[in-house]
């Protein structure tokens, strides 16, 4: 058997790489021919009275299978006086940039990985060569963030949501990030996670997930609630019949959220209450009593036990700091006692059915998801870079990143004839079929899963569905 392998003179890995390289060469050739035919189609179907050909220019686009150099016509737009590549516009790609397919893969790797360099190396390991530079990936995320922010800002300005829900859950938290420049070397990222409740992951599952979850994150501390509330108003029809439950720690800026909705209540997050009790009462006999009282929303027992612990700490010089902190917590409970009562108890008293409602606290886990990419790996950020990454992460966690990564323009404003899309796809199919001669194709990465494949599995499924690949 060893002799047989030696006679081949090649290992499976070497064979795999050799075949893959040939596929890359074939892909580039096919793409060049397809682009040539599509440019000819654009030339035939353009608005001839508007677009005049001036010359033919070369371009290059980075794709999943390598750089594709191609030539296309350069037009004068007689209406605007500007020059334009109609093919690039029609395909929503610019020479010198990355293809939509590579954009999806790069964006996925950028938000999942620890850094842009790690994203570059991940793609390099997958394809066997450097597909794209880390700076190109960074620029991609910046453009992606700008695109998302413009769309979200437009929605906030309109603020005409139509979805109606009886109860809207709003969970808020903040965390600090390291910045690269400016007077503030650390800035607080404020985050809102809103949802409509909980549902089991599967019919028999004991694990739950949030229903219609949406995020809003901002570095602008002054206008946080103004923008965050409009984010919700752009999605929901919120009126006096909509109960908005705001959950968060004892920070004063979180409590202000109730002022932005007609009917809202604020609850101090149960996790934060218990964390403070454990920290302040560690080693005291009041700890267990206070924890149990907090679970029952028994404020009378909670405050009396806290008072006992505070008074005892006051008598010891080494516990004066503890005394002050317990006293501050006690004053907070007495000033806004309703905020320390479980929201379900309060809603039940108002006639709401709370049987399917669960304890709140999603903001804490979502902070971990975001901070894992933004702060736990030692990064420091520019304001622009941070905002772009945050927008990309939001869309990733909401399952919408791929949509924005492959964002396409409308070509009907540029070309005559609604049949252009159908004809373009037909040309692509015909050329691909003629050059490759492939009748049956099975691409393993189609079955690798979206996260594992960096979004490529969904891309290949789309190609298969459109019959660009026959499986």
Describe the function of each predicted region.
Residues 42-73:
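N-terminal juxtadomain amphipathic helix
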Residues 1-32, 74-471:
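Catalytic center-proximal scaffold of phosphoryl-transfer enzymes
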Residues 26-44:
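N-terminal "assembly arms/tails" that initiate or stabilize quaternary assembly
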């Amino acid at each position: 058997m060893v002799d047989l392998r030696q006679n081949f003179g090649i290992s499976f890995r070497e064979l795999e790489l050799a075949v893959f390289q040939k596929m890359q060469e074939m892909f580039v050739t096919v793409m060049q021919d397809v682009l040539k035919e599509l440019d000819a189609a654009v030339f035939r179907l353009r608005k001839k009275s508007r677009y005049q050909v001036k010359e033919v220019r070369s371009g290059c686009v980075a794709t999943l299978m390598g750089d594709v150099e191609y030539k296309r016509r350069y037009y004068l737009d007689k209406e605007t006086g500007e020059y334009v590549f109609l093919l690039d516009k029609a395909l929503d790609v610019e020479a010198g940039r990355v293809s939509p397919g590579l954009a999806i893969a790069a964006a996925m790797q950028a938000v999942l990985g620890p850094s842009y360099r790690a994203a570059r190396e991940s793609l390099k390991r997958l394809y066997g060569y450097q597909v794209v530079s880390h700076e190109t990936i960074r620029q991609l995320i910046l453009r992606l963030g700008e695109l998302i922010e413009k769309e979200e800002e437009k929605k906030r300005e309109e603020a005409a949501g139509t979805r109606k829900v009886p109860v809207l859950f709003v969970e808020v938290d903040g965390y600090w990030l390291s910045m690269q420049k400016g007077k503030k070397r650390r800035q607080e990222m404020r985050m809102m996670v809103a949802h409509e409740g909980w549902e089991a992951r599967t019919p028999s599952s004991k694990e739950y997930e949030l229903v219609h979850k949406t995020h809003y994150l901002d570095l602008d501390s002054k206008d946080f609630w103004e923008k965050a509330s409009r984010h919700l108003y752009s999605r929901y029809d919120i009126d006096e019949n909509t109960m908005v439950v705001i959950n968060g720690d004892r920070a004063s800026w979180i409590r202000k959220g109730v002022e932005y909705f007609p009917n809202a209540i604020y609850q101090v997050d149960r996790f934060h209450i218990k964390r403070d009790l454990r920290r302040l009462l560690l080693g005291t006999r009041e700890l267990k009593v206070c924890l149990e009282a907090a679970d029952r929303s028994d404020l009378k027992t909670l405050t009396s036990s806290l008072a006992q612990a505070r008074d005892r700490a006051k008598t010891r010089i080494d516990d004066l700091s503890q005394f002050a902190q317990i006293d501050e917590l006690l004053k907070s409970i007495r000033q806004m006692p309703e905020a320390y009562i479980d929201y379900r108890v309060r809603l039940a008293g108002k006639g709401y059915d709370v049987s399917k409602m669960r304890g709140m606290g999603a903001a804490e886990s979502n902070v971990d998801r975001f901070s894992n990419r933004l702060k736990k790996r030692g990064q420091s950020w520019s304001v622009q870079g941070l905002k772009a990454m945050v927008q990309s992460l939001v869309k990733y966690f909401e399952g919408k990143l791929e949509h924005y990564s492959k964002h396409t323009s409308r070509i009907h404003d540029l070309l005559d004839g609604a049949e252009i899309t159908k004809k373009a796809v037909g040309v692509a199919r015909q050329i691909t079929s003629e050059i490759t001669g492939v009748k049956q194709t099975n691409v393993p990465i189609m079955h690798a899963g979206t996260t594992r494949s960096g979004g490529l599995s969904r891309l290949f499924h789309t190609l298969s569905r459109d019959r660009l690949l026959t499986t």
